[in-house]
């Protein structure tokens, strides 16, 4: 009996070696293996720390730059819109600083989604896309006009989240740190300020449905998209750390702002209207929450996009800069395409001004530049690869106007061009092999 008691006293933790008398609890496992309460607690802490590290690793892929560095990167790709770039740089930095420091904070920081207001073609989508590229986070674009309230024909708001999951290659942890840009947000305003007995399923109903995911909640997303039904499996995603950027042209909002600040329009003079259009960015910068509510946004929605920024209407000078200055400028892209065929492409200054003028007159902004450029370049892109005597293609003002074809400079001897083409052809044949 004494020996049995002595053996029991000698039982020790198999991990730390402490005896039963030195710990509060000693649990027995198979094969005379024991673990004490202190080692259990230590194991729990290690597992929890590794789990937190895994979550942090998903977020650690975020390339968080300082606001000034973010703006400097934006400057390489986005022409003009200085105020908007500054506001977005600060807001995005604060959002991801909150995300990366969340477990170390003793004060809960609420996320600040962003509302961008600006005319068509002012660069709203492009700015949001460039921000995601800077930060190395998944990015998805959703069209608010396709959304309807649950139970009606159209897309559920959860389908927006499926797009960010797909952008992250179904890596849910990574998707939860992404950026979602909701375009045409001004098209889901309620139809009337007065309460109606009929449901507004594509206006106020969509705004109501968006509230939860904007604020942060765990949403159930159908993996194949479409409508939910009770017998399908769902993907769970937490939207707390997803940054939502909403954008829209908000046509007519400037009149609400004018009425509030006391500016009056006199008569129907077209010149006055044109002057107001040039000043539309300044008016949008004075937008207050009550202006958005009067426009048709519900107060709860306005409260969930607290950061507002305005983008200016791009004038002809800005459009010329967009054609030439950014790292991925359209003219640089076309020059590279011609260079691959061994041809030098030259744009005359007057030609660029004409292309910018046509885009400005069409009121398509930066978005319309590529379509115009494509029509100007089409004949040359069709002929030049075949005609090996062409060394240079010059886009003149007349060719930009569509009055004549681009000027082609040919060599008396096509040898130089043929050598360049042989290199390309050789590379292509090797790739095929």
Curated annotation (Swiss-Prot):
NCBIfam families from the UniProt entry: clpX, PRK05342.1
Stated role: ATP-dependent specificity component of the Clp protease. It directs the protease to specific substrates. Can perform chaperone functions in the absence of ClpP.
Disulfide bond: present as a keyword of the record?
no
Assembly: Component of the ClpX-ClpP complex. Forms a hexameric ring that, in the presence of ATP, binds to fourteen ClpP subunits assembled into a disk-like structure with a central cavity, resembling the structure of eukaryotic proteasomes.
Superkingdom, natural source: Bacteria
Q: Where is this region: Disordered?
A: 402-433
**Under which name does UniProt file this protein?**
ATP-dependent Clp protease ATP-binding subunit ClpX
Q: Which gene encodes it?
A: clpX
> Which organism is this protein's natural source?
Lachnoclostridium phytofermentans (strain ATCC 700394 / DSM 18823 / ISDg) (Clostridium phytofermentans)
Q: GO terms for biological process? A: cell division; proteolysis involved in protein catabolic process
Q: Which part of the chain is the ClpX-type ZB domain?
A: 1-55
Q: Where does ATP bind?
A: 119-126
- UniProt KW keywords: ATP-binding, Chaperone, Metal-binding, Nucleotide-binding, Zinc
Protein family: Belongs to the ClpX chaperone family.
The family database entries (HAMAP family) matched by this protein are listed as:
ClpX
Q: Name one Pfam family in it.
A: AAA_2
From the record, give the cysteines joined by S-S bonds. Answer: none
């Amino acid at each position: 009996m004494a020996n049995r008691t002595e053996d029991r006293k000698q039982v020790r933790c198999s991990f730390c070696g402490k005896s039963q008398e030195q710990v509060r609890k000693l649990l027995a496992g198979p094969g005379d293996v024991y673990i004490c309460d202190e080692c259990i607690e230590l194991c729990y802490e290690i597992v929890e720390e590794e789990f937190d590290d895994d979550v942090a690793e998903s977020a650690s892929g975020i390339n968080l730059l300082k606001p000034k560095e973010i703006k400097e990167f934006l400057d390489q790709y986005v022409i003009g819109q200085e105020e908007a770039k500054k506001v977005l740089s600060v807001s995005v930095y604060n959002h991801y600083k909150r995300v990366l420091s969340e477990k170390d904070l003793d004060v809960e920081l609420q996320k600040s989604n962003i509302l961008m207001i600006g005319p068509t073609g002012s660069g709203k989508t492009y700015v949001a896309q460039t921000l995601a590229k800077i930060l190395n986070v998944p990015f998805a674009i959703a069209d608010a006009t396709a959304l309807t309230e649950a139970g009606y024909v159209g897309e559920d708001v959860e389908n927006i989240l499926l797009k960010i999951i797909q952008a992250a290659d179904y890596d849910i942890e990574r998707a939860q740190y992404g950026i979602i840009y909701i375009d045409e947000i001004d098209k889901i305003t309620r139809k009337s300020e007065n309460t109606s007995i009929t449901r507004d399923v594509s206006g106020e109903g969509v705004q109501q449905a968006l509230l939860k995911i904007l604020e942060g909640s765990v949403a159930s997303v159908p993996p194949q998209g479409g409508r939910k039904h009770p017998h399908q499996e769902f993907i769970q995603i937490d939207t707390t750390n997803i940054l939502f950027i909403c954008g829209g042209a908000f046509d007519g909002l400037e009149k609400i702002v004018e009425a509030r600040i006391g500016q009056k329009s006199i008569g129907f003079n077209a010149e006055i209207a044109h002057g107001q259009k040039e000043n539309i960015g300044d008016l949008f910068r004075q937008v207050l929450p009550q202006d958005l509510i009067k426009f048709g946004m519900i107060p709860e929605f306005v409260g969930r996009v607290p950061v507002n920024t305005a983008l200016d209407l791009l004038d002809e000078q800005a459009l010329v800069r967009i054609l030439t200055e950014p790292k991925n400028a359209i003219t640089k892209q076309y020059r590279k395409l011609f260079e691959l065929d061994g041809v030098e492409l030259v744009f005359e200054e007057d030609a660029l001004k004409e292309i910018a003028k046509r885009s400005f007159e069409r009121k398509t902004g930066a978005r319309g530049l590529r379509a115009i450029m494509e029509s100007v370049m089409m004949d040359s892109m069709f002929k030049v690869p075949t005609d090996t005597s062409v060394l240079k293609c010059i886009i003149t003002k007349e060719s930009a106007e569509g009055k004549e074809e681009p000027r082609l400079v040919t060599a008396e001897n096509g040898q130089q061009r043929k050598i360049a083409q042989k290199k390309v052809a050789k590379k292509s044949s090797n790739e095929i092999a």
